[in-house]
């Protein structure tokens, strides 16, 4: 009987109650707020990291571009322009022949300008590009006012390349230098040169002045050499020489045989 009693006592003994920890009213809300703050902080950090990575990639790309040689940059730009032209060809398949030629001329002109900017980056091409278009220069016939020519519209007076400027020179110089013997030509030439170079930078004007000084020195040497030659020729022409017309012979006559007697002096 004793063991059964012990069993009953063990069964009747209940475990001690667990005292539950009392929660404060704001404890759950603080946990939620902390989780929100942590989420916001992590989002800000991710944005900062993304911006930093983007800035780093951009800086690396710029550094890589700067390391490229000028020739590489030119080739890349040419390739880009060719790709753009090919894209335009595919988009403008319906254009006529005249439009296609005009587009190709414009593309070639833009490519030449870009090439010049790449090769001569220190030259202010924007200043030349932004210069106002030339005014109309109309020359009319005095006897027939209806006969007029706008020189500014002629392709000759719209040079853009070295060969085109050379053509302007070879066209105008023969027309102008034919007047060089006229009294007003020298004064006109001085004013003409000033007007030609007044819009150029001082460095270019200095180079032009130096070339004129060199030309002046060469002309002075030529003139001095010519003066010396003329003086020698003139001296040779004006040299006095004794010219005798009588034959050179020995006089054998005696002065005593002159046919006069002593009494003739009396």
From Swiss-Prot:
Protein biosynthesis is among the record's keywords: yes
Residue ranges with Acidic residues bias: 26-44, 86-97, 254-266
Annotated transmembrane regions: none
UniProt xrefs under Pfam families: eIF3_subunit
Protein name: Eukaryotic translation initiation factor 3 subunit J
Disordered as annotated region, ranges: 1-111, 217-266
Ranges annotated as biased composition (Basic and acidic residues): 45-61, 73-85, 98-111, 218-230
Keyword Coiled coil: yes
Oligomer and partners: Component of the eukaryotic translation initiation factor 3 (eIF-3) complex.
Main localisation: cytoplasm
Intracellular or extracellular location(s): Cytoplasm
InterPro entries per record: eIF3-like_dom_sf (IPR023194), eIF3j (IPR013906)
